[in-house]
């Protein structure tokens, strides 16, 4: 009998890891049951010279095939500028983590422009907006909320099938053309379990 080689040991370890992940995916029924967390951050300077360190965190970024609820936390945002938090198609040309490529409005988004299905929020201190959709910033430009996500953004626009999708922040309708607050956390959906 010959001793196992490093290559054989690595193959075995990879097989065990892959099997463990395959066993976990069907159990990820809710965001809280999944260990996958996404992060985005960038530092921005406004025309007034103020600097903001934007941080965005989402739990979970791997959802069941039918969708699920994701907990989202933001901090460091400019309280003088409202933002939209939504689930959108990642525009062509955007390279995640490279804000110099964030030149196009993220669209389409789940729920459309006037979403009331829990798939989007407007965060603002202006005090106007749709109850349950519009929420105020907390101290330090923070916000904590949930998003209810599903893979079909619109007819024929399906995440992980026809497009790539992400939880995004962007300036609200008071500054739609500004890309200063754009951030992306990609989200994926586990394949439907056959059997």
Where are these regions (language model features)?
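C-terminal effector/interaction modules appended to NTPase cores
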Residues: 14-17
């Amino acid at each position: 009998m010959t001793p196992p080689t490093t290559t054989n040991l690595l193959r075995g370890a990879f097989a065990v890891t892959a099997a463990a992940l395959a066993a976990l995916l069907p159990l990820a029924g809710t965001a809280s049951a999944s260990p996958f967390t996404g992060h985005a951050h960038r530092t921005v300077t406004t025309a007034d010279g103020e600097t903001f360190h934007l941080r965005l965190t989402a739990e979970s970024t791997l959802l069941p095939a039918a969708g699920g609820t994701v907990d989202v936390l933001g901090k460091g945002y400019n309280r003088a500028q409202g933002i939209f938090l939504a689930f959108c198609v990642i525009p062509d040309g955007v390279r995640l983590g490279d804000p110099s490529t964030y030149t196009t409005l993220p669209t389409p988004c789940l729920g459309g422009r006037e979403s009331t299905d829990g798939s989007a929020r407007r965060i603002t201190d202006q005090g106007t907006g749709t109850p349950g959709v519009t929420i105020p910033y907390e101290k330090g430009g923070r916000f904590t909320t949930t998003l209810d996500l599903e893979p079909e953004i619109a007819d024929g626009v399906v995440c992980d099938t026809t497009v790539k999708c992400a939880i995004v922040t962007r300036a609200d309708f008071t500054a739609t053309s500004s890309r200063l607050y754009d951030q992306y956390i990609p989200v994926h959906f586990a394949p439907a379990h056959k059997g």
